Regions:
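Bacterial N-terminal signal peptides
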Residues: 8-17
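Non-cytosolic beta-sheet module surface loops
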Residues: 89, 119, 281-282, 312, ...
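Extracellular beta-rich repeat passengers
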Residues: 349-481
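Extracellular beta-strand-rich solenoid/capping regions of secreted or surface-exposed proteins
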Residues: 117-119, 173-187, 195-211, 217-234, ...
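Bacterial N-terminal signal peptides that target proteins for export
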Residues: 1-9
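Extracellular beta-strand/beta-solenoid scaffold signature
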Residues: 219-226, 240-242, 262-269, 285-299, ...
Length: 481
C-alpha cells in the first residue's frame, strides 16, 4: 500500500513538473539606463520568485503646447502557462492601483505598496499607481521563444548561413554614429538582455528579419528600426522608439513595442506600402501611434491591404490612428483595404482641434480613402480629443490640394467609456469630394448602444446627436445600427 501511494505521489510530482509553466528573465546589462521607481518580481505558479530589471524610458508630457520629458519604467520577461507578478512602488504610499488595458480584466490585490496579479497569456500592460500615467511601468509579458546563444544557433534554427546572422547577445552596445544595416536574406537577432544604443535599418532588402526581445534605443530623436524600400520583411519582438515602413511590400510586424518622447515621434508609420500587417503591438508615442500615408518622405504611391490586429495605442500627443493627409496630387492615390481589429486606445491628449480624433481620417492631396473596417476597438477616457475625425479637407499646412473622398467605412463594436471626449466630426469637402457610406454598428458610449431605432430617441433628433457626432456638409449615407 505504501509503495502504491509513493508511486502515485511520484507520478503526480512528475506530472506537475512536466506541465508547470516557465519564466525567463533577462538581467539588464551594465551601461543601460535603469529606473528604481518599481521593483518587479515574477514566478511561475508555485515556483521561485525572480527579479525583473526595470529600464528608464522617457515619455512626453504636454501642457498647452509645451513638452516636458518624464521618466517612466519599462520591464519585460517571457513565460509559458501562467505567471504571478508583484510590482512594488518604491517612491511612496500606494493608495490606488490599476493595470491597463482595462479590457483585459486583470484582477489586482494590493499588499502595502505591492500590486499583485496573475497572467495566463502574453500581454502588454501599463501598471499605474495613484493615477500617475507618466511615471508608470510598461510591463511586457512575452510568450516564450527560443533563446539563442550565438549566431550559429540562429542560423541552424532558421535554415540560413551563419554569415547572414547579425547577432547581438545579452550586453550593452553603443553604436556611436554608426547604425546596423540589415540586407537581403539577413537576420538581426537582438537577444533578451541586449541593449543597443543606436538604430537599425532594413534598407533595399528582401527576405530580411529583425527578431528577439531585446532593446534598440537611439536615446535621441530617431527611428529605432526602419523598413525602407524592402520586400518580405519580418520584425518580431523588439522594444524600440519607432518602426516606420516606407516604400515596401509584404512586411510583418509583430510582438513589437515602441515608446517615443520627442517631436515627430510617430510610432508605426506606413508610407506608400502594400501588404503590411501588425499583430500584438504596443505604441506609446509623442505623435501619432499608427498612420497610413501615401507619397511622403521620398516614398511614392498609395497603400492597400494594411491590417492591424491586437494593438495597444497610447497617444501622449496627436492621434492613436491617423489615415490620409499626405500624397502626390498628380497621382490621385488611393488608400484601401484597411482593417483595424481588437485595439485598445488608452489615451489621446491633443489640444489642437485639427489633430484630434482617436480614429482619424483627414483626407488631403487628392487621395481617395475607401473600403476600411474598424472593429472591436475599446477607448478609455481620454484627456483631450475626439472619438472620430473623418474629414475630406484641405490642410494648407501639410497638403497641396483637398482630399478626393472618403467612402465605405465600417465601424463595428466601438466602445468609449468616459466624459472628456469632444464633439466628433464627419464632413465632406464639396459635391465632388464627398464623405459617404460611413456605417456604425454597435457603437456604445458609456454602455449605451447608439442606433437609429434606439428607445427614447425623439423622431426629430439625429442618431448622431446621442454620440456627439457632428455630420456636416457633403456627408452622405451615415448609418447607425
Amino acid at each position: 500500500m505504501k509503495h502504491r501511494l509513493f508511486t502515485l505521489l511520484f507520478l503526480q510530482l512528475v506530472s506537475l513538473a512536466l506541465f508547470a509553466g516557465t519564466v525567463t528573465t533577462y538581467p539588464a546589462p551594465s551601461g543601460a539606463p535603469l529606473n528604481d521607481d518599481f521593483t518587479v518580481r515574477v514566478r511561475a505558479t508555485g515556483g521561485l520568485w525572480q527579479t525583473v530589471d526595470t529600464y528608464a524610458w522617457n515619455v512626453d508630457h504636454t501642457n498647452n503646447g509645451r513638452h516636458t520629458i518624464e521618466k517612466s519604467s519599462v520591464a519585460y520577461f517571457d513565460f509559458t502557462d501562467k505567471v504571478e507578478v508583484e510590482v512594488t512602488w518604491n517612491k511612496g504610499d500606494v493608495k490606488t492601483a490599476r493595470v491597463r488595458p482595462l479590457s483585459k480584466n486583470i484582477a489586482t490585490t494590493l499588499h502595502g505598496n505591492t500590486v499583485c496579479f496573475s497572467l495566463d497569456r502574453p500581454l502588454d500592460l501599463s501598471v499605474e499607481v495613484n493615477g500617475d500615467t507618466y511615471h508608470n511601468l510598461q510591463l511586457y509579458a512575452n510568450a516564450a521563444t527560443p533563446v539563442y546563444k550565438n549566431a550559429g544557433q540562429v542560423a541552424k534554427a532558421l535554415g540560413m548561413k551563419k554569415k547572414d546572422v547579425l547577432f547581438y547577445g545579452p550586453g550593452y552596445y553603443d553604436l556611436g554614429n554608426d547604425s546596423i544595416r540589415v540586407g537581403s536574406n539577413q537576420v538581426l537577432y537582438v537577444a533578451g538582455g541586449a541593449y543597443i544604443k543606436g538604430f537599425a535599418s532594413v534598407w533595399q532588402a528582401s527576405h530580411a528579419k529583425v527578431i528577439g526581445h531585446g532593446i534598440v534605443n537611439p536615446e535621441r530623436q530617431h527611428e529605432g528600426i526602419m523598413v525602407r524600400y524592402s520586400t518580405d520583411v519580418m520584425v518580431d519582438g523588439p522594444i524600440t522608439t519607432q518602426i516606420p515602413v516606407g516604400g515596401s511590400e509584404r512586411v510583418s510586424v509583430r510582438n513589437a513595442k515602441v515608446i517615443s518622447w520627442y517631436g515627430w515621434g510617430d510610432g508605426m508609420n506606413v508610407f506608400a506600402s502594400n501588404d503590411v500587417s501588425y499583430n500584438h503591438v504596443f505604441c506609446r508615442t509623442s505623435d501619432d501611434c499608427s498612420t497610413i500615408y501615401c507619397t511622403r518622405k521620398d516614398y511614392h504611391g498609395g497603400c492597400h491591404n494594411i491590417s492591424v490586429t491586437d494593438a495597444v495605442y497610447w497617444a501622449d500627443v496627436a492621434h492613436p490612428i491617423m489615415i490620409g493627409l499626405h500624397g502626390d496630387i498628380e497621382r490621385n492615390e488611393v488608400i484601401e483595404q484597411v482593417v483595424y481589429d481588437d485595439i485598445d486606445i488608452l489615451q489621446q491628449r491633443e489640444k489642437q482641434i485639427d489633430y484630434q480624433g482617436c480614429i482619424a481620417i483627414n483626407n488631403g492631396d487628392n487621395i481617395t480613402v475607401r473600403n476600411m473596417t474598424f472593429r472591436n476597438i475599446r477607448i478609455d477616457d481620454i484627456d483631450e480629443g475626439m472619438l472620430f475625425n473623418f474629414r475630406v479637407c484641405y490642410n494648407r499646412k501639410y497638403c497641396h490640394a483637398p482630399g478626393g473622398g472618403i467612402h465605405d467605412i465600417t465601424l463595428e463594436n466601438i466602445s468609449y467609456n468616459g466624459s472628456h471626449a469632444n464633439l466628433s466630426l464627419l464632413t465632406g469637402y464639396n459635391e465632388q469630394r464627398t464623405l459617404s457610406g460611413i456605417h456604425f454598428k454597435n457603437l456604445r458610449i458609456n454602455g449605451q448602444r447608439i442606433h437609429d431605432k434606439m428607445p427614447g430617441k425623439p423622431g426629430w433628433y439625429k442618431t448622431s446627436d446621442f454620440a456627439r457626432i457632428f455630420i456636416g456638409e457633403h456627408a452622405e449615407n451615415v448609418t447607425f445600427e
